[in-house]
Amino acid sequence: MELKGVHQQNGTSNGTGAAGTEGESPPPAPAPATAEAAASLETTTEKVDAEQQKTERTNWGNGLEFLMSCISVSVGLGNVWRFPFTAYENGGGAFLIPYIIVLFLIGKPMYYLEMIMGQFTSQGTVKIWSVVPGFVGVGYGQAFATICIITYYSSLLALTLFYLFVSFQSVLPWSYCWEEWMNCVDSRPQEDTDALLLSSSNVTNVTALTDTVKLQSSSELYFLNVVIKEKMDISDGIGDPDWKLTLALFVSWVVIFLVIMRGVKSSGKAAYFLALFPYVVLFILLVRAVTLEGARDGIIFFLEPQWGELLNPTVWKNAVVQCFFSLAVGSGPIIMFASYNRFDHGIYRDAMIVTTLDTLTSLLGGITIFAILGNLAHNLQIENIRDVVRSGTGLAFISYPDAISKFQAVPQLFSVLFFFMLFVLGIGSIVALQSTIVTILCDQFKSWKYWKVALATSICGFLMGLVYVTPGGQWILTLVDFYGGTYVVFILAIFELAGIVWIYGMQNFCDDVEFMCNRRVSLYWRVCWSFFTPVMMIVIFIYSMVTIEPITYSEQFFPEAGNVAGWLLFGIGAAQFPLWWMWYISHHREGSLGQSFVASLRPSDKWGPANPETKRQWVIFKNEKAAQRATKKQSSKMGAFWQKLGHFCGSNT
């Protein structure tokens, strides 16, 4: 059967889907008896096609918009913000080997699988579960985790905008020590110390310090004392939102809404800038970072593997978590973006480009920030780079500003460029996450206007983000990231893979991929999807839950109420899976409870390509593949029979 071209045809009927799920070919339409009847049928077909065009899902303007959009979300805050401090917490170079192994055995397979599911069905994170209707809770749980991630990602945008605004000052405010800061070291070059505009008489001289005094850079003290006004204890509350950060948060959400208000028509055009501009600034910063004194020690710490850490399961767990966040798998954006593709778009190439570029960008960001950390350790006279600065959210807002302060020429210009780049990266990430939620709602409620849903969700995102711009906001961010983002995404990704590969079936899934992409699925993907990826994820998740410890922020434990709230957050996200499964069974009874349970694991009539004609061709293709396998199996049995008969006859002659 010729597959080329059938994917873009428009069908005349919406009733071919049921046959596809039952494995039977639809009966051929009766031929019209007269030319008049044929003309009437043609007219009817044209009307149906015209009606379908009105309700057809919007597509990307071109394939490059899709690729740029995937790059903008996968090459984002996860690379520049999260990857460096995750590597920092896990021994630098020791983290690279597990991360690269995890990328090939979990990251790439999951990324490609989600691209396939979105493009094949032209549906969002929830609607794709017509493949295994009982698993629809996976989609809703991932939506819950996505909302959690959106709320604190937007607070990072607020911090970025704050730094962007103050970068226009004649002297960068974090480059020098303020009078009230003791044991502080200027972030800008020491030869510029005499040029301070403010008195620094209270700043401790580095050479006069004893080994027992801990020095802090002015960039770190500025972030903690001026920007977030950090509370070291939230037992009495988290405080009120800071008005400056609140304003920055509002501006961030206005920009997000403007980008997504027209769906892929607007976000696709913005993707070119969102994907490409950050590389220009990151390369400039890299060139400067590697020329700083002490940068070599930091880069060596980042790249030199510590083989003993390979036996530490925690490092592997963190590698999986980072891979998920960096590639944005398990939370819906990849499925959502791919759902706006043409059915025959070449996603294999795009998946390989994005996952490879994502890794290279993570390495680029890692080298940049560890070069900066090496310089910071040199200036603070600290031998162990691990002890230079606290890891966590503040790393990007401490180490990067510290490096910018050391630029000899117009550091304000580079600061503006850098924080604008960081803002662009954040916009790219949140646009994808926010569009995922909007797509879920618009898929569910067809009559809702896309821009109205985008506006409503943006307002909700702003209101929920206010909690993170309080003095205790970083505590809440740590809590939500750990319980509402990391573990919820992890466990639901396991169910996602199990539902598609183990319940729907590897053979069925590979047939669908072959029909859509017109190429057979290689052994690498089959082995990863069916064995390596799910087994590794299950083992790492079980280990994580067995060895889980109370989380800390700035080396302090959360109050008991915080841990209870965290587990409640995790419970809400994870419970979506069983609760929606029970709901489906109770609302789709087919005989006994056991029969209803089995039915919930079979594809529904809605499963398959969205285009009716493409779906009809898919049904034919599936039936042909099933017939070929049956014939091959029968031939194999007959061959074995004649072989045994030959051996028997030969032994009796």
From Swiss-Prot:
Topology of this chain in the membrane: Multi-pass membrane protein
Main location: membrane
Domain of life of the native organism: Eukaryota
InterPro entries per UniProt: Na/ntran_symport, SNS_sf
TM stretches of this protein: 60-80, 93-113, 125-145, 146-166, 241-261, 270-290, 319-339, 353-373, 413-433, 459-479, 486-506, 528-548, 565-585
Keyword presence, Mitochondrion: no
Basic and acidic residues bias spans: 44-55
UniProt record, GO biological process: amino acid import across plasma membrane; D-amino acid transport; neutral amino acid transport; sodium ion transport
Glycosylated residues (UniProt): N202, N205
Subcellular location: Membrane
Record topological domains on the Cytoplasmic side: 1-59
GO cellular component assignments: plasma membrane
Protein known as: Sodium-dependent nutrient amino acid transporter 1
Organism: Drosophila pseudoobscura pseudoobscura
